[in-house]
Amino acid sequence: MAPWLRERMNRVCRALGVQRMLYGWRRADGAWLPHTRIHGATQVVASASLDIADHVYVGPFNLLDASGGLHIAEGVQVTSHCALLTHSSHHALRRAGRSYWGAANPPGFVRQPTHVGAYTFIGPHSVLAPGSRVGRGVLVRAFSYVSGDVPDHAIVAGQPARVIGDTRDIDGPWLAQHPECRADYENWTLAR
């Protein structure tokens, strides 16, 4: 199917709230990403500020808040019921009360870009706070709250999320059994 037709069908499906996986995404710079899949039940806020690579999977019932700049690298998987946030008003609203409404820049309002590195997995019901920088090859376990920096290849869990392991420890034995995958694995783990 032609990319323009796929894109038009995806827009109609999103507008109608169609509950299915939609294949292909047109980035704000015009690039067509044929292998990126974003479920129709996922809400994308400020898509013009979404910097997303190809080969990304975003499952159902997620919130991708790109209003402050959301960067999702190649091969990222976002499962379901996750929030990738780039702004937060909860402190500002609580502190300012009614004076929050209409204020140009209310105290406590946060807007920061969030980055998710290549081949990272984000488990169900996880939240990435505004300004988070999640490295490459990270495994974010279910129900985690991530804030701040997460190093490459970390396994993180909890609220707040803490490093509990390294994905290379579980990848090594598997790669020993599947040597045909080692070259591709090393290409993305070593690339910058």
Where are these regions (language model features)?
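Flexible, glycine/small-residue-enriched loop-and-beta-strand segment within the central core
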Residues: 42-52, 57-133, 159-160, 166-168
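Terminal amphipathic alpha-helical/low-complexity segments used for targeting or macromolecular assembly
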Residues: 1-35, 75, 82, 88-94, ...
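Short helix N-cap motif at coil->helix boundaries in the Bergerat
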Residues: 148
